[in-house]
Amino acid sequence: MAHAFAIRDVRRRLEESNGGYEIVHRSPRLEIGVYVLVAPQADTQQPHDDDEAYVVLSGRGTLDVAGTSFAVTEGDALFVEAGAEHRFTGYESLSVLVIFTRAD
C-alpha cells in the first residue's frame, strides 16, 4: 500500500490557523504529521514513548533536547530518542515534518 500527501496544503492550512499539528498518515508502526509553530505560541511537547524525526520545512529556530540546543533551519533533519525532553524555541514561524516510529 502507498499514500501521497500534499504537505504544502497541510502546512498552509496550519499556518493560516496560527499553528498546530495534523497527522497525514498513521499505521501500526509509523505516524507522519506536520507541526507548525507561530510565535508567541509555545511548543508544549512532552517526552514521547516513541523515537521521532523532524525535517524542517520552513522557518528557523532552536531545538532544545535534554539540555543541548541545536540551531535549525529549512532542510535540516533531526532525531529525538524516545523519552527525551525536547521543544522548539526561538522561532517566529516554524514548520516541520514529524515522523514517529511506533514500537511493536
Residue ranges and their predicted role:
Residues 1-34, 41-44:
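A short, N-terminal "cap"/entry segment at the start of jelly-roll beta-barrel domains
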Residues 35, 54, 78:
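Conserved GNAT-family N-acetyltransferase fold
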